[in-house]
C-alpha cells in the first residue's frame, strides 16, 4: 500500500502493488496514532500465543511499515461461531466488535455459497488463523480511532486485466480498473 492519503472523512489508498490485510493495517498505523494504541487494544482480545511486530520497511524505494503476526501452534481452522465468541468476549468497543463480526459473517456466507454448505458448517482456513483475526480486528480498531472514514482503494498507475485471487479452495478472476470504495 502506497501513498495513503487521509482527508478527514475519506481515506484514499493507492494500491498500485496490491493490498493485503497486514499491508492495510501497517498503513493505518503509519498515518494514525501509531502502534502503542493498537497494542493496548489487542490485549483486549482473548487470543494467545501470538506476537505482533511492527517495523520500518523499504521496498522498491518506498518507505512504509511492515506488520507481522507470528503465532505458535494453535487454531488455524475456526468456524464462524469460534471467531464470534472470541470477538464477543473481547474488551473491544461494541462498534468494533460488530464490524469485525460482520466482516467474518460476510466471509462465511461467501465460503458457504462457494461450497454449497450452510454457514454454520463453514470452517475458515486462512482467515481463521490468528494473523487474519488480528489483521481484521486491527483494521477496525484503527478505523474507529480515525472516526470511521470512508476508505477508497484505487490504483492510479494501472488498469488491470485478468486479476487472479487464490485461496485454499477457490480462485477468482476479474477485470477492470482497480477502484473500490469500502463501507464497513
Segment roles from a protein language model:
Residues 17, 45-46, 128-130, 155-162:
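Acidic, glycine-rich active-site loops and adjacent beta-strand->loop/helix elements
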Residues 13-25, 124-147:
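Conserved phosphate/anionic-ligand binding catalytic regions in large, soluble enzymes, centered on
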Residues 35-36, 148-184:
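Mobile "lid/hinge" segments at catalytic clefts and subdomain interfaces of large enzymes
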Residues 24, 64-66, 163-169:
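Short acidic, glycine/serine/threonine-rich loops at helix termini
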Residues 30-115, 174-184:
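Glycine-rich nucleotide/cofactor/substrate-binding loop typically near the N-terminus or early
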Residues 5-11:
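Extreme N-terminal starter segment of soluble prokaryotic enzymes
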Residues 89-98, 123-130, 161-168:
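Flexible, glycine/proline-enriched loop segments at strand-loop-helix junctions
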Residues 109-126, 130:
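Alpha-helical transmembrane cores and adjacent cytosolic helix/loop segments
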Amino acid at each position: 500500500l502506497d501513498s495513503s492519503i487521509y482527508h478527514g472523512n475519506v481515506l484514499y489508498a493507492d494500491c498500485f502493488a496490491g493490498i493485503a490485510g497486514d499491508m492495510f493495517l501497517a498503513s493505518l498505523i503509519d498515518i494514525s496514532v501509531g502502534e502503542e494504541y493498537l497494542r493496548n487494544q489487542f490485549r483486549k482480545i482473548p487470543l494467545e500465543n501470538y506476537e505482533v511486530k511492527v517495523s520500518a520497511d523499504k521496498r522498491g524505494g518506498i518507505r512504509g511499515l511492515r506488520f507481522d503476526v507470528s503465532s505458535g501452534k494453535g487454531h488455524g481452522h475456526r468456524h464462524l461461531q469460534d471467531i464470534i465468541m472470541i470477538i464477543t468476549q473481547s474488551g473491544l468497543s461494541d462498534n468494533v466488535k460488530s464490524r469485525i463480526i460482520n466482516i467474518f459473517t460476510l466471509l462465511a456466507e461467501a465460503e458457504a455459497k462457494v461450497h454449497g454448505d450452510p454457514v454454520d458448517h463453514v470452517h475458515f482456513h486462512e482467515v481463521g488463523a490468528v494473523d487474519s483475526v488480528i489483521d481484521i480486528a486491527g483494521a477496525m480498531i484503527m478505523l474507529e480511532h480515525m472516526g470511521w472514514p470512508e476508505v477508497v482503494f484505487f490504483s492510479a498507475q494501472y488498469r488491470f486485466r485478468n486479476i487472479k485471487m487464490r485461496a485454499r479452495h477457490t480462485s477468482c478472476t476479474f477485470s477492470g480498473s482497480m477502484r473500490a470504495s469500502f463501507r464497513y
